[in-house]
Amino acid sequence: MPITNASPENILRYLHAAGTGTKEAMKSATSPRGILEWFVNFFTCGGVRRSNERWFREVIGKLTTSLLYVNKNAFFDGNKIFLEDVNGCTICLSCGAASENTDPMVIIEVNKNGKTVTDKVDSERFWNVCRMLKLMSKHNIQQPDSLITEDGFLNLRGVNLAHKDFQGEDLSKIDASNADFRETTLSNVNLVGANLCCANLHAVNLMGSNMTKANLTHADLTCANMSGVNLTAAILFGSDLTDTKLNGAKLDKIALTLAKALTGADLTGSQHTPTPLPDYNDRTLFPHPIF
């Protein structure tokens, strides 16, 4: 069930549409333990499982609003997120300290009448879900079933993002394969490690963006403005760069010869250090295009 309007209310409706059940099930789901389990599932899977989720509209409404004002660095430095009066409970989200051998974990505490239940979730997956909620709200993005992919990427697969303005956004580690970015503003955007396989990037503005290690396999970049873009170690297999502006771009460790077309491309002042050709039979790197 896609979200057609990414307001907090509609995000909630989407997340909780499957919820039905008895009074006993509702009581269990909205107990401190039930609320805690819902948060763990949500921040682990980027979605929810079928278990009376319609009772949590208030939770996501407050969470989405809170996240609009949360700074990642401040949160990881010790600032906490509080959600008050969720079925009589107070929820506290905080980042625990990293140990020598493990990354930090996000601690979820649910308190009611002086009793507290706690659990932990992976900090990277937690913040990716937060990033996705913020992007959906800010840019009114129509979203498929899961906020993040099975690999932990922000899930923008096949999404229509045409004519939007993402200037200066952090879009690192997104999976936007087969997405439509036509005439979108992506200048000064962080696209490090982004999966843009088979994406339509016709006439986009990518000036000054960081696309290090981005996967542009079979992407349509015709007439795009990529002046000053950092494409270090990016994958351009089968990409169409016809009439693309690449002046001043950093093209180190890439194989331009694998691009589908460079006709009319402007490479003035670009820095190109070629790399040995990869194995283009490897379909994990070079999947077949979907048209």
Curated annotation (Swiss-Prot):
One of its GO terms (biological process) is protein secretion by the type III secretion system. The keyword Secreted applies. Pfam families: Pentapeptide, PipB2_N. Residues 154-193, 199-238 form the Pentapeptide repeat domain. Its main location: secreted. GO terms for cellular component: extracellular region; host cell; host cell membrane; membrane. It is found in: Secreted; Host membrane. Induction: Expression is regulated by the two-component regulatory system SsrA/SsrB. Induced after bacterial entry into host cell. Keywords: Host membrane, Membrane, Repeat, Secreted, Virulence. It comes from the Bacteria. SUPFAM superfamilies: Pentapeptide repeat-like. NCBIfam families: PRK15197.1. PANTHER family: BTB_POZ DOMAIN-CONTAINING PROTEIN KCTD9 (PTHR14136:SF17). Effector proteins function to alter host cell physiology and promote bacterial survival in host tissues. Does not appear to be required for the formation or the maintenance of either Salmonella-containing vacuole (SCV) or the Salmonella-induced filaments (Sifs). Not required for intracellular replication in phagocytic cells. This is Secreted effector protein PipB.
